[in-house]
Structure formats: structure tokens, C-alpha cells
């Protein structure tokens, strides 16, 4: 693996499978009375969040603490950033404090890459979401969830998602989750289809390694997993569809549409979800919806990322065995 995790596109097939397998080892920690490993004891990790976050920030913090790291939570609100301090000055301040890793979420696409390559800080950089660009750990936890559900927890070890048919539905234009998932799922051998109104597809979509469709009903019977994406109104400065009701009628997933999916197929959502728009309460609360599993799996994936970037090259299971003695 590379030193930093900036983009899902940077991962090779072997990198991704190794991460998923390591996450399976980390998931076993959650089943123990004491959910703790000594792997990152003495290491300092900063969660540098310039955008609001619930799941990602808490998930990273839980992962860091389960690996025994010293954790510093930084938010732009209430810091010198609100007074006009630049990313460079913030990075140099963290460097002066000797931090070992920075988990960064930023509204500007490319900010994590800039931090990792600028020379401002000599720390591992992990992208927790940058603008509409990338969210690699979200793609990893989604792939982890798919592999567990569609292949099996034990049967999936060492395997990718070759031949699986994955459909992403909704606001592709503004979604870093969609971009990251397309990159990673393609690397893992899955067949990806994007479904959205033309106004919510980015320019240059034809160069992405996926198919594009506009009719949700025709894609559902051929899907092993359907991921519903929220319409990101906070990133919109114009009307991209007539009304919410019209959008939901054409691109929302309800019980009748879910019934068209194969029996083994799952429904996914990266959160936060808007019930009644892209997904109904009936679907969100069904056994086929993996939204809560994705949150759980996110901690295991982020533990695996932190472990592999900071902890060394030994198998994660060796640390587990040491802890259990």
C-alpha cells in the first residue's frame, strides 16, 4: 500500500482485498468483552474536520481508540480556522506537535492530496471526504459489507467482488461516495451501473468504468446490491429536478420496487438518508437494508486502514492473539 490513503483509485486489487481481510480480523475485536488492541499505543492521530460529520468522525475516533492511539479531535468551528488560518498554517502547527497521522475531511476537492504532498507535515494522511471528489474509507466499508452479504464472512476471505452487479442510484454529480465506489468496485471486479436523471450526472461520465442508465425499474432485477444516494441540496445552487415528489416517483426505492430485486440482493445507503425521498421507511427498516451494518463495518475498516498505514506489516491476528493471552 501507499503511505497515504487519498483516493480509492490508488488501491490495487491486492491492496483492497488485504484491507478487507484485515478488517475481518479487526471485526473480531468487537465481539470481545474488551474491545481494545495495543497496536497504536504511543501514536497520535488528529481528526481534522473542516466539514460537519457524524458517522465518519465518530467511526474514526472509535477505530483509533480501539487501537489504543492518542486521539485529538479538531473542528474548524471554534478553532483558528474560523479566524482565517490557512490549511498550511494548521498543518505546520500539527507538525510541530509531532502527530503521526491526520484524518482530514475538507470541503475543497484535493485538500487531502495537498496536505499529503506539500511537505507541510510528515504524517500519514487519510482522506475522510474531500468536496465532491473522494471518500475512500466509505467505499471500502461498502465493499466489505457487500462481500460479507453476497459472498460470506469466512468464504469471502481472499476474494474480491468479481461478477457482482452493483447499482448506484441518485445524486451522482455531487457524490464523492459514488466516485469512490465506482473506482473501488471496478478494481474488485464488480459490474457497476449508475442510475440518475441526466441533470445529476457529471460531465465526462462516459469515461468512468461503469454503465449509465436512466430507468431504475429495468436495472433492479439484475442487481445484487442497490445503493441509494441522498440528493445533496447543500451543494446545489440550481434546480436539478422538477419536484421532490417527481424525483421520488422516478428514482426512489419503495417496497414495490424492492420486490423486483433478486431475493439475495441487498439495499445499501451511506447515510444520512432522507426517508420518503430516495428511500421509504419500509425499505430502510427492512432486513435487506444494510445501513446500520455499514456503520458497524466502518469501524472495522478504519481500524484496518489505521493499522496497515501506521501499525506495521505483521498480520493483524498476531496482535489479537497477544491481547488475548
From Swiss-Prot:
Instruction: Give the keywords, sorted.
Output: Pyrimidine biosynthesis, Transferase
Question: Per the record's keyword annotation, is Transferase included, yes or no?
Answer: yes
Coiled coil ranges (UniProt) are none
**Listed GO MF terms:** amino acid binding; aspartate carbamoyltransferase activity
The record's GO CC annotations read: cytosol
Quaternary structure, per UniProt, is:
Heterododecamer (2C3:3R2) of six catalytic PyrB chains organized as two trimers (C3), and six regulatory PyrI chains organized as three dimers (R2).
Similarity comment text for this entry: Belongs to the aspartate/ornithine carbamoyltransferase superfamily. ATCase family.
NCBIfam families this protein is in? asp_carb_tr, PRK00856.1
Q: What is this protein called?
A: Aspartate carbamoyltransferase catalytic subunit
Q: Which organism is it from?
A: Streptomyces avermitilis (strain ATCC 31267 / DSM 46492 / JCM 5070 / NBRC 14893 / NCIMB 12804 / NRRL 8165 / MA-4680)
Q: Which gene encodes it?
A: pyrB
